[in-house]
Amino acid sequence: AVISNIGGETVEKLTRAFYDRDTLTVARELLGKRLVRVIDGRPLTLRITETEAYIGRLDKACHAYGYKRTARTETLFAPPGTAYIYLIYGMYHCLNFVTEAAGEPAAVLLRAGEPVSPADADAMAQSRFGCSAEEMSPYQRKNFLNGPGKLCKALKLTKAQNGLSLLGDEL
């Protein structure tokens, strides 16, 4: 197990071996796991509720289908357990976890999640809407973290975090 100090809290992280497996298996097993993002020394935690697998050798929807390497897709070829973050429609960031062996372009997209605590919900609501969780409208509450771009905005994830190791202390 990888033990990490995240925001002053000792946590057991998933190992590289967890990510170095079949992408569909990893996608299923990520459901219910917690993602911790440290911002200004404070950990924000969400439970992963929806994932989607992309396998470059098989899936035409994968950015690196057919082993296509570009500046954008280079992170998909990184070691398993690497964060792959990219921008879609010029405005929404998407977080993926690289899976399978290095050089094999495959990843799991995090599609949705839910805050673990009221404090996490407040911090994420502030990032998304500029208000506390209690002040969110019913519509905002219903659609809080139900999309990859919404999840990234709530966790303040951008392309600046692309390539981060999931074994480290920031994610």
Q: What spans do the regions from the language model cover?
A:
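Conserved, well-structured core segments that form or line functional sites
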Residues: 3-171
